[in-house]
Swiss-Prot record:
It comes from the Eukaryota. SMART domains: B3. Gene3D superfamilies: DNA-binding pseudobarrel domain (2.40.330.10). GO terms for cellular component: nucleus. The keyword Transcription regulation applies. This is B3 domain-containing protein Os12g0591400.
Length: 661
């Protein structure tokens, strides 16, 4: 998304507005010392931007804006940057409904219609200054209910002047005429609102069950105009059908909301701005808890997950869900704003496999710079532009950096208890890790072989980008162990060996939770093991822990195979006979390529040698082979070692159980 689409949200606390740090980094160098604030009625204000305590703050000129639009504590403002130091501003009251903009008038300026008031005594006549009133309903628990002298179910709002009265800046219009075209939040509105259906807006903050409820004030104004199914549209143009039901006199989003929430990864504290544009259609903007507009993901169609990937990092899982960036998103958003004056392009790395020895430059950018760059170019990373994870969020504790989310990669069928999850959170809070904690569990293979798999995304990003030795130590202990990390595997994880002595010294067994803290220094990479008070991880036959969140569990299959297949533990880890393997197979871990006779089918599987038993096992990738070829109990596989091949290759001849005599 280009800078033209950047937005942030601000809740009025105090008498100034501080621009969120993340947003300030996005627009650094793009705005002047004075910015223009534009409200929906078209009026603009010049406001000075000052830098104070490493923050951008709106100062000179802000007071006039705040007075004209009667800003109060806890009012919510949405700032959308439209380029050229210009922001479009929408104002919401604390109950989440968009405020009726005050009628801003010029000092002593005569109105332009016969019968109107000859002069305005004040440059601003707010609704509260009028002498006649009518009632409107308020949502429950509204801050206005605490005001003395105000009825708990109504608020005094000005009655409009006579229809023949209007001023140069704006005029009131007939409420009956407004009822259909504008659907304004309050019963009456200004004339310009009749032609702006998006003015009918409300804001929701996601807090447990409240995120689905449409504000009562808004619901009352659109009652009878919304069908049983609403259409939610996000800025990237995608729409979602969500069922609306009436429960306890409230309108609630039901069926379809979960799909929307998952697609855009809604989390606790996110803020959503809903704009009603008629015909049961809402336009939705999404802001994160730091008040910056979220980068909207787009749905990736026909993208399958590798069947033998039972361990995924949060980033890998997010990529394999319908909620990641795709080439359509790049085409539709990143390239649209480019022209001959622009000198930049974006590349999105979808996975580790995208990191190759070459990088294709987009055709449009290549056309822009054709004939202007030499055959060899220099790549520089700007030191003053931090990554998204390095940017510090403003916090009440003085701007301390938020602790990074841990990486949960648990084997199939292993779940963490709530007590263990709480212990992880307490540990994060205590040690404030610079690199996310890596959390996994001991499974049968790890205990037997003395090996442990690491999510390759995590290993590449935080540990190593090549094969090397890592120092392993226990928190508070002096003893260290050397482990080897194999980054040459073709799967989504990296195999580490040399753990057997560590497992024995720490009395680790199957099902125990392991929490590792990674750190880097000039001497290399180190992993610190943090023991748990209650480390055993319960095993479930029905659920596995989602790698995205420590508290969310999703149903998952026990093994990647067809419904008719029921493999034993031995078959899940294909083992070759010791006699055959010692004579014909290599004696170090490597990948094996599996082929079928007279077909082009190929599959890679990890060959692991258990040095204690000399067993040769096919591990990661074998499950995919079983699933691809629909192997069942009593099927026979004949493995033929292919000679004169640079890489270890075996042809597998499959004899189905019905074919055996």
């Amino acid at each position: 998304m280009g800078d033209q689409k950047r937005s942030f949200i601000n809740v009025m606390i105090g008498d100034f507005v501080a621009v969120p740090t993340k947003f300030a980094n996005f627009i650094r160098g793009q705005i002047s010392e004075v910015v223009k604030l534009e409200v929906p009625n078209g009026k603009t204000y010049d406001v000075q931007v000052a830098k104070e305590h490493n923050e951008l703050v709106l100062r000179s000129g802000w007071g006039a804006f705040a007075r004209d639009y009667e800003l109060k504590q806890c009012d919510i403002l949405v700032f959308a940057y439209s380029g050229s130091s210009r922001f479009k501003v929408r104002i919401f009251n604390p109950s989440g409904c968009e405020k009726e903009l005050s009628c801003v008038m010029m000092n002593n300026t005569p109105c332009g219609h016969e019968g109107s008031m000859s002069y305005h005594d004040n440059h601003l006549q707010s609704p509260s200054e009028s002498s006649s009133f009518f009632n409107i309903s308020l949502p429950p628990h509204s801050p206005f209910q605490e005001l003395s002298g105000v009825d708990s179910t109504s608020l005094l709002v000005s009655d409009p002047p006579n229809m023949q009265q209007f001023c140069l800046r704006c005029s009131w219009t007939n409420p009956k005429r407004l009822a259909k075209p504008s659907l304004a939040i309050a019963s009456l509105s200004h004339q310009h609102l009749a032609f702006d259906k998006t003015r009918c807006m409300f804001i929701l903050k996601i807090e447990n069950d409240t995120l689905k409820t449409i504000l009562k004030m808004f619901a009352k104004n659109v009652q009878g105009l919304i069908s049983g199914v609403a259409k939610l549209e996000v800025p990237d143009g995608k729409t979602y059908d969500v069922e609306i039901s009436k429960e306890h006199n409230e309108l609630v989003f039901r069926s379809g909301w979960e799909v929307f929430a998952i697609a855009y990864e809604l989390e606790q504290g996110d803020i959503l701005a809903f704009g009603y544009s008629g015909n049961s259609h809402f336009k939705v903007q999404i802001f994160n808890p730091s008040n910056c507009e979220k980068e909207l993901s787009c749905v990736v169609m026909n993208r399958s997950i590798s069947d033998d990937n039972h361990r995924q990092s949060p980033r890998r899982e997010r990529m394999n869900k319908p909620s990641t960036t795709c080439m359509d998103c790049i085409t539709n958003h990143y390239w649209l704003h480019m022209d001959d004056r622009e000198r930049y392009f974006f590349k999105v790395m979808m996975s580790v496999s995208d990191i190759k020895d070459e990088l294709a430059i987009p055709k449009k950018f290549a056309a822009n710079v054709r004939g202007k760059i030499p055959e060899q170019v220099r790549l520089e990373v700007s030191d003053d532009v931090p990554s998204s994870e390095d940017i510090k969020d403003p916090m009440s504790s003085g701007g301390l950096q938020k602790s990074k989310k841990s990486c949960y990669v648990l084997p199939m069928l292993y779940n963490m208890t709530s007590a263990q999850e709480s212990e992880v959170l307490a540990l994060e809070k205590k040690i404030q890790p610079q690199i996310p904690l890596y959390i996994t569990a001991m499974d049968k293979t790890s205990v037997a072989s003395g090996s442990l798999v690491f999510c390759k995304d995590y290993a590449v990003r935080y540990l190593l980008d090549q094969n090397r030795t890592i120092k392993l130590c226990q928190s508070g202990g002096s003893k260290t162990w050397d482990i080897s990390l194999d980054m040459d595997t073709d799967d989504l994880y990296a195999l580490s060996t040399g753990w057997l002595d560590f497992f024995r010294c720490n009395l680790l067994q199957e099902g125990d939770i392991c929490v590792f803290e990674a750190s880097k220094s000039k001497r290399g990479v180190a992993l610190t093991f943090h023991p748990f008070k209650e480390s055993h991880c319960p095993k479930s036959s029905e659920y596995t822990l989602s790698t995205k969140s420590p508290t969310r569990r999703v149903p998952k299959r026990d093994y990647f195979a067809t419904n008719l297949t029921n493999l034993t533990d031995q078959q899940e880890r294909k083992c070759f006979s010791v006699k055959y393997a010692s004579k014909y197979l290599p004696h170090k871990d490597q990948n094996m390529r599996l082929r079928l006779p007279e077909t082009k089918y190929k599959c890679k599987a990890a060959l692991h040698i258990d040095t204690s038993t000399n067993l040769h096992k096919l591990l990661k990738g074998w499950g995919k082979f079983v699933n691809d070829n629909k192997l069942e109990i009593h099927d026979i596989c004949l493995f033929q070692l292919m000679k004169n091949k640079k890489k270890l290759t075996m042809t597998v001849h499959i004899i189905r159980k019905g074919e055996c005599s």
